[in-house]
């Protein structure tokens, strides 16, 4: 099975990327190597819309439920 790599953008994992000449570039981590306490990955809000049966657009749903549905953890 292949590796899953993610980009963490918090202060703990930030580093200066000297090779590319960019400052504050985030460090890439192999998600399979993290401890369970660090392995939680946050995805943005997930919205399921049946376009054929619904006349509510995505922006309306985001506006109405942005305080209720903040994030999903796997």
Curated annotation (Swiss-Prot):
Pfam families (alphabetical): Orthopox_F7
Signals that turn on the gene: Expressed in the early phase of the viral replicative cycle.
Key words of the record: Early protein
Taxonomy, superkingdom: Viruses
Similarity comment: family membership: Belongs to the orthopoxvirus OPG051 family.
The protein's name in its UniProt record: Protein OPG051
Primary gene name: OPG051
């Amino acid at each position: 099975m292949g590796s899953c790599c993610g980009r963490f953008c918090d202060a703990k994992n930030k580093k200066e990327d000297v090779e590319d000449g960019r400052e504050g570039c985030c460090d890439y981590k192999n998600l399979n190597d993290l401890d369970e306490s660090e392995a939680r990955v946050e995805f943005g809000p997930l919205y399921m819309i049946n376009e054929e049966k619904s006349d509510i657009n995505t922006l309306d749903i985001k506006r109405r439920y942005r305080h209720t549905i903040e994030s999903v953890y796997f």
